[in-house]
Structure formats: C-alpha cells, structure tokens
Amino acid sequence: MVAHRARRRKRASATQLYRTCKAAGTCPPDVIPKVEGTTLADRILQWGGLGIYLGGLGIGTGSGTGGRTGYVPLSTRPGTVVDVSVPARPPVVIEPVGPSDPSIVNLLEDSSIINSGSTVPTFSGTGGFEVTSSATTTPAVLDITPATDNVVISSSNFTNPAFTEPSLLEVPQNGEVSGHILVSTPTAGTHSYEEIPMETFASPGTGNEPISSTPVPGVSRIAGPRLYAKAVTQVKVTDPAFLSRPTSLVTFDNPAFEPGDETIIFERPYPPSQVPDPDFMDIIRLHRPALTSRRGTVRFSRLGTKLSMHTRSGKGIGARVHYYQDLSPIGPTEDIEMEPLLAPAENAAGDSIYDVFADVEDADIAFTGRSRSATSSRGYTTVSPLSSTLTTKYGNVTIPFVSPVDVHLHPGPDIITPASTQWPFVPLVPADTTHYVYIDGGDFYLWPVTLFVPRRRRRKRLSYFLADGTVAL
C-alpha cells in the first residue's frame, strides 16, 4: 500500500513576510533584498545606468510593458496613423461700410408677401356717400339741417364657412303652428332614460327588528364592586362624618376642599397618634361611595386600601377594607283599606255620614236624621253637623270654621198660580212637602268632626263633604 504524501503548503509572498518580519528581524535572507530592490541584478542596472541610458527600453525589475510604444511583433511593421484633416470653412466676405452708409445690417432677405385671402367686400347701398380729398385750405362747413327725405340703408352679411364665431350661433327656436301644437327643430341623437325601482323606507314591522347595526346578543350586565369577597375586611362605621367628611376620620387636618363622590388618595399613611379613628389606620386610598341594599337596609359603602408593608423593590402591599354604614331600614309595604262610598240601609242615626251619591227619594230621610242629635252606645254624643262644638268623653272640643266661601245658587222654575182661583182655596190632599237638593261637585274631604272620634272597630265609616261645588235648591 502506497502512503500518500502530505501536500506542501505554499509559503507567503515576500511582501507579506516583509511586513511582519522586518520589525522583529527574523526575515529570510532573500526577502529583504527582493522587496527593497538590492539584488545583484538591480545593482548591475544601477551601475550600468550611470553611463548608458536605458530608460526608453523598459528594462528593469518592473512589469514588462514594452516601453512607451509597446512590444512590436517580429517581421511586421508598426501601423501608421492616418490624419484626416477637416476642410476649412470658406472665409466670410467682409463688406466695407463707408461713413455715409447705414450701420444696420439686414439679417433676413426680402420676405415675400403672404396671401391674406379674399378681399373684404365693399359696402354697397342705395344712399351711400363718397369721400374725396383735395388740397384746398378752405375750412369745411357742415350742414346740420335735417334731411327732408327718409334714408333707407341696406346691408349684406357674408358668412365664412371656415370660421363661425361661437357667440353668433343661433339657437333653434320653437314655432307655434296652431292651437296647442308646438313644433321644434330636431336635435342630433336620442335621449334614453333609466327606470330606477323605488324602495319603501318605512314599513310596519313585527317589533323584533334590531335597532342597531351590530346588535349584541343577550343582556350584558355591568359588574359591581366586589365588597363582600373573602379577601375584603368588613368594618361597620357609626360616625355620621363618614357620609359627608370621610377625611376627618383619617387625619386631623382641615382641608379646603372635601371631595364627596370621588376617590380620596392620601400621600402617606399617618402615624397612629394622628388618626382620629383607629379603624382607618394605614389608609392610603378611599374609593368613591356606593349605595347598595342588603338585608332590608340602604347601605353607604366605601372601599379602602391600606399600606401595611413595602417590598425591596419599593412596592407597597396592603389589605382591602370595606367600610359601610346602614342608613335606614326598608319597611314592608302598607296595605291601604278602601272605604265604600255608599252607606248601608241599616246605618244608625248617630253615624253622621253624608252620602252624595244616595238616591233622591232618601234625601228627606237623610236630612231629617242629620238635623237632630243622636246618642249611641259607644260613649260619645254628636250634635248637628252644622255645629262647631263636639262633646266627647274627653270634654268639649271647638272646631274653628274656615272663612266663608261664595256659593252659587241656581234658582229653579217659576211657580205660576192659576188665573181663576176659587175661594175658599182647598189644598190638595195629601200635600207634597218633599224638598230636593241637587249637589254638583268633584272633590271630597273628610268631615273635621270625625277626626276626633275614637275608633274602636276595624271598619269605620267616615263622613265626606264637598270642597268646591254648586248647590241648587
């Protein structure tokens, strides 16, 4: 088996070796003369150049370029350069200018006359005039007397089809031929129209249509403050200053501005000696108030943040406290018992009830029963409703009346007696003594007498009277 020889590594060039070994003094003996040009061949050329000029031959240690003219191939002649001369311009003839000749030189030759087209037609008419010129110096005298004959002047228009002024274009006119028929000149082209379908903007719907462009499915609820979480301490505050001046519970300072519905931020936790309420110790923030209802009460709440410790990074850590104060309980709804307006038939005479919706036939009975006093077995006595004194078991109570009010009286029909009366007059038997009272009103109030009557039964019928109305007898 033949062993392969290792490849020979190429040595660096003399220039690269000279750069690194010159300063250290470790260069090989053939590197420095080759780079500095002190070899034997260089010295022979230097010595021979003292007496012989060899600069034009290009002999030296440099790159071979063949000198100034380059290398010339053997058995050939160098190429010759043909010089092509540019013909000379003819000399400009200089014309002599005399003292009396003009100094202006015409740059252009005589130009030819450009044809301007057809001539403008001359004016022709029946009553024209001619202009004559003369060399006389006699002043002209104009006759300003008006002419006796009427002068008619006619004119002719010539249209150039090559050019028409836009301002002189004639617009086609409409001509009325007969009654309601209008004939117009036809125009170029036809005008077409497009049928656009009409859509209804408002139409009756089912009520389930969306009212916004992107309706949100379902109902989104706003999350309230988490006041009753396990990590929140519950503290009840009884001081009423917690509602209006919560900062007075944290510090003794008297601030000029007391924010009510905003978050209160304290710069630093105050020492225990400067905190009026110990429950508000180490408080650095009190959030805005919130009103809630819990277990039948209206509760005023504020969420506070305490600063208990600091970490090495400077961040403060503290607990959250829920301060609350119950304002008032929410009582159950009371049931209001409705009282009937119509009185039963077995009503006692002592119960003074004024029923304005009673029948007309019962008016006389009700009037008779109300005009006398009645004593019941309940231990109190009532008098006529027109009286202002009420006698009870507690003594006499005087009820003052209000100022008199004008009552409008509407008279009834006139009573006309018969013209022929027979004497002696015999009245009809039985005589009709019924009197009717018509009351028209809308507002009713409790009779003041019934306010001082003790109620012992659950269902008590109260009296009513008119606040404003009219009475007709």
Swiss-Prot record:
Ordered alphabetically, the record's keywords are: Capsid protein, Cytoplasmic inwards viral transport, Disulfide bond, DNA-binding, Host endosome, Host Golgi apparatus, Host nucleus, Host-virus interaction, Late protein, Microtubular inwards viral transport, Phosphoprotein, Viral penetration into host nucleus, Virion, Virus entry into host cell
Q: Does the keyword DNA-binding apply?
A: yes
Q: Which InterPro entries match?
A: Late_L2
**Which terms does the record give in the GO molecular function aspect?**
DNA binding; structural molecule activity
The record's Pfam families line, in alphabetical order, gives: Late_protein_L2
UniProt feature coiled coil, ranges: none
Modified how: Highly phosphorylated.
- List S-S links within the chain: C21-C27
Describe the function of this protein.
Minor protein of the capsid that localizes along the inner surface of the virion, within the central cavities beneath the L1 pentamers. Plays a role in capsid stabilization through interaction with the major capsid protein L1. Once the virion enters the host cell, L2 escorts the genomic DNA into the nucleus by promoting escape from the endosomal compartments and traffic through the host Golgi network.
Cite the record's note on assembly: Interacts with major capsid protein L1. Interacts with E2; this interaction inhibits E2 transcriptional activity but not the DNA replication function E2. Interacts with host GADD45GIP1. Interacts with host HSPA8; this interaction is required for L2 nuclear translocation. Interacts with host importins KPNB2 and KPNB3. Forms a complex with importin alpha2-beta1 heterodimers via interaction with the importin alpha2 adapter. Interacts with host DYNLT1; this interaction is essential for virus intracellular transport during entry.
What name has this protein been given in UniProt? Minor capsid protein L2
The record lists the organism as Human papillomavirus 28
